[in-house]
């Protein structure tokens, strides 16, 4: 791959090499008085870190919410649960992991500790854990069984550790941060490679009625030291929450967003180090990274969105929800509105009281995978002759390789890419992918087809990012074109796909 990249860059004009091959960084500072042109140039060169790029390519990840809530039939426990209620009769973590892997998922996250403070491993620092349960006579370790299954089946492994702990008497004091670090250290050192650490933002009261001031930076430093390749998600510096639990991302989803003064102060303090900062501000706004948003920014960071949603109405298993499992078509629609909107999907599939994924969930995941395979088995664009007057490497858009990409010549920020098929083709899905390793750049585009010597609009969009999927009424055409109307410097495309779905 390195040799291809070298050949590609050698073939580019010097000015274009400079635009595409500027040293990669996942943050930049913006000085007072910089022009919009200078800011856009910087924004175009903010790129994901290696761990962020690896994470983005996962596309599909799974959440396993499992704990005392599974047995008390609650969503949020109060920390006063009798540990003896936790007693799965046939726990099979391999069944969990095998099911989601066969459905196309690349990584799983287990709720090692939820807000109730109950630990799914035999932590040395609390009695509120599996060691006080009858399951395996107090010798069991759910986290180990999940991590072992992930190693065996070659799938990513992550942990969710709730900062809020409604059981710990230390909560609300500085000593709790030590307690939390001790538990986090156990998770980071006892289970092999950890690919993601997930912190949510809940911060309620503990048993003493106090709230906790979380020492996020201390936690980040620990993770970076013990598991340097792990992404830190949601209340962390690598991945942000999309802002909703509906499974829907934004129509305009920028991974490059403004950094506030607190973020920039942390970045400055970590100069020449691996940057880590706690997220601030409202990440639920519809627009986080447009030109209007970044115009007055103090800095810019690569901060991509994770879209979390449960396959059921609740996050933990409830028997009454067996008839409310999301259908394969609903899961397919969620894929389009999460991964297809420049995000990564984190789908929760909660194990039941036996300790297995329910047959209802399993069947719908299997059918979802079948629907995905049918839909994306053939990229019709591969059969077309592709031309772009100001473009380079047009073949890269249909070669199936993410690392190769199309771009424009000179300093062109627009492009018209025309496809001509041997005969008319019917399609109803557009798939686009930028090569985000060199930045996120495309701001608007339109797809058109030719009918009776007239170009007619099929669909249009704003951002692309890692992946953009658009579904529309089926079109039958021999000539199609994609017009990139606006881009931050030269646009790139790793994939241009046209598909016919059910």
Annotate each language-model stretch with its function.
Residues 1-22:
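Bacterial Sec-dependent N-terminal signal peptides
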Residues 19-413, 418-419, 423-433, 440-441, ...:
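Mature catalytic domains of secreted/periplasmic carbohydrate-active enzymes
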Residues 435, 450-452, 501:
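Inter-blade boundary loops/turns of WD-repeat beta-propellers
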Residues 446-448, 497:
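Beta-strand signatures of extracellular beta-sandwich domains
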Residues 490-502:
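Exposed low-complexity, polar/acidic, P/S/T/G-rich flexible segments that act as propeptides
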